[in-house]
């Protein structure tokens, strides 16, 4: 597996509340994670850092999980535990009241990839030169779009587009979505925060992923492109290809 992680403050925000990275368990099986924190007084970066650290630390203690079913079970259970830890910590610190974070994570299982998500950080797959979104946003705007109350055009500039219906650290229990999809040689997996998807149209995202650039260059182009369109939020990108091997590395 070859992975490239990038995170950038953007052009407007004073702090980067995104977090993520690539981490391996005892059998060198990787997990890739992106989290986008929220909350005032830098509480957002505490929440996203906790989510990534707690999930990756738990993963580092495991041995290889070989089936998609095993991985789904582990992700659901562990993310639930991570959520409880963030809630308890927020309750113990007055300055952190109201903090939370999105989370999207992926683990490879033989010829498949298992993805888990909470919030509006997304997972995409480029397969057969077509980019498709794997995850569903847990947001007010997505719900309005799903029920036909607003159009896609309305959604792009909706005044309440940042309101999440699910996030880690908000309530004692959280619903975690999981997806299992084929992941083949030459496919590219993209995990990202909304600082990318709110700035760069999916048609351009697809063109970048289909280009002849290296994976590292593609990651850099995503950050540059999002900033060129305004960089209104923190931008985080994690790209994964199956056909190369690279030792996992932490990043934040």
UniProtKB/Swiss-Prot annotation:
Name the EC number(s). 3.1.3.16
> Which cysteines are disulphide-bonded?
none
Q: Pfam family of this protein, just one?
A: PP2C_2
- Entry note: cofactor: Binds 2 manganese ions per subunit.
All residue ranges annotated as the PPM-type phosphatase domain in the record: 2-242
Please provide the Gene Ontology terms (biological process) for this protein: signal transduction
Task: Please report which protein family the annotation says this sequence is part of.
Answer: Belongs to the PP2C family.
Location relative to the cell: Cytoplasm; Membrane
- Entries under CDD domains matching the protein: PP2Cc
Q: Please write the reaction equations for the catalytic activity of this protein.
A: O-phospho-L-seryl-[protein] + H2O = L-seryl-[protein] + phosphate; O-phospho-L-threonyl-[protein] + H2O = L-threonyl-[protein] + phosphate
Q: Which residues bind Mn(2+) 2?
A: 36, 194, 233
Q: Which NCBIfam families match?
A: Stp1_PP2C_phos
What is the recorded name of this protein?
A: Serine/threonine phosphatase stp
Name the source's superkingdom.
Answer: Bacteria
């Amino acid at each position: 597996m070859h992975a490239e992680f990038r995170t950038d403050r953007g052009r407007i925000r004073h702090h980067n509340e995104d977090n993520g990275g690539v981490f391996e368990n005892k059998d060198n099986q990787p997990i890739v994670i992106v989290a986008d924190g929220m909350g005032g007084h830098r509480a957002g970066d505490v929440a996203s850092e906790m989510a990534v650290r707690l999930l990756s630390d738990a993963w580092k203690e495991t041995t290889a999980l070989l089936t998609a079913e095993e991985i789904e079970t582990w992700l659901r259970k562990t993310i639930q535990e991570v959520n409880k830890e963030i809630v308890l910590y927020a309750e113990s610190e007055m300055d952190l009241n109201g903090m939370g974070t999105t989370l999207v994570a992926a683990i490879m299982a033989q010829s498949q990839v298992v993805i888990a998500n909470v919030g509006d950080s997304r997972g995409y797959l480029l397969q057969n030169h077509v980019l498709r979104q794997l995850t569903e946003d847990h947001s007010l705007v997505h719900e309005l779009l799903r029920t036909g109350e607003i159009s896609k055009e309305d959604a792009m500039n909706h005044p309440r587009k940042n309101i999440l219906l699910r996030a880690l650290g908000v309530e004692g229990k959280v619903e975690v979505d999981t997806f299992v999809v084929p992941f083949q040689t030459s496919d590219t997996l993209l995990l990202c925060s909304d600082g990318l998807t709110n700035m760069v149209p999916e048609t351009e995202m697809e063109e970048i992923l289909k280009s002849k650039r290296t994976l590292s260059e593609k990651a850099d182009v995503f950050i540059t492109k999002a900033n060129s369109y305004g960089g209104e939020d923190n931008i985080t990108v994690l790209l994964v290809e199956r056909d190369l091997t690279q030792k996992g590395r932490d990043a934040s």
